[in-house]
From Swiss-Prot:
This is SsrA-binding protein. Its main location: cytoplasm. Keywords: Cytoplasm, RNA-binding. The gene is smpB. It comes from the Bacteria. GO terms for molecular function: RNA binding. One of its GO terms (biological process) is trans-translation. It comes from Mycobacterium leprae (strain TN). One of its GO terms (cellular component) is cytosol. InterPro entries: SmpB (IPR023620), SsrA-bd_prot (IPR000037), SsrA-bd_prot_CS (IPR020081).
Amino acid sequence: MARNPRGGKQIVATNRKARHDYAIIELFEAGVALLGTEVKSLREGHASLADAFATVDSGEVWLRNMHIPEYQHGSWTNHDPRRNRKLLLHRRQIDTLVGKIRDGNLALVPLSLYFAEGKVKVELALARGKKLHDKRQDMARRDAQREVIRELGRRAKGML
């Protein structure tokens, strides 16, 4: 994976189903405590957030079930691909998360994993799970929006 010459975000992995399955309430950026072979594997662009989720245990936030495959050139120092990884947040942010999770039926869902200024960051969302009818409404809204754009394009081209 090539480095970003402008120093912006270099996205490694995204959780595409998260925005479909959850209604996002608030976004957080957190650092991730990783081992050397994990960082090398991420630099090659290998990671999956498909089944990942975050939990708060005894005042610490943990990212669970994220898959970072073993580094190809690593030896006995390689890591466990599905190990729990600690997320680095300020105490106030953790306290806010704990309060909001306790109050409502909310979950912490990772949306993307990226490099920012050489450090691995994860974009976390405080989210509420969508019901089936919510997903259908979103799909209908997207279809209607697509149809409006298509119609405007036809009119602009003079097809009607």
